[in-house]
Regions:
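Mixed-charge (Asp/Glu-Lys/Arg
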Residues: 1-41, 46-146
Length: 146
């Protein structure tokens, strides 16, 4: 049984745990998982489905309400997935699979931030903003593995 006191882990530890957990989830559904030693293109691993379909996966761990991916690190299509994992103390992580194509039509949950105003220095990003009531209607779950 894993330690479920996630708040005791730092940002790097929770991210590393999330990546391993995601790989185990994919493997448990019969996917082959391929990991690169260097994460310089925004892909944490590649998963090959039992039907032979290859998916590029970016894992994002969150303890609060917002997480983002730099726009230059992901392609907006169905072959690129975000494995969004929400960590709350006392429970196993909630796992959601989100096709990157959702950002082709941004909304209140799947946001686009370009930071083009004077003085803004952040690079453009795609965000996932899940607050309050939105959480219960968040429709992407691990059923997408099947």
């Amino acid at each position: 049984m894993p330690n479920l006191n996630w708040s005791k882990l730092n940002h790097m530890q929770i991210g590393r745990y999330a990546e391993y957990y995601a790989k185990m989830e994919f493997t448990s559904y019969g996917y082959d998982v391929y990991t690169s030693e260097v994460d310089d293109h925004g892909v944490d691993f590649v998963a090959k489905s039992p039907q032979g379909v290859f998916l590029e996966v970016q894992v994002k761990a969150v303890r609060d309400n917002y997480v983002f991916i730099r726009k230059d690190k992901i392609t907006l299509d169905d072959a690129h997935l975000v494995c969004y994992m929400r960590f709350s103390d006392g429970a196993l992580p909630e796992v959601y699979l989100i096709p990157a194509s959702v950002w082709n039509t941004p909304n209140a949950v799947f946001v686009s931030r370009d930071y083009e105003k004077p003085g803004q220095k952040s690079k453009p990003e795609w965000g996932i903003a899940v607050y309050g009531a939105q959480r219960s209607s968040f429709r992407f779950r691990t059923a997408a593995f099947r």
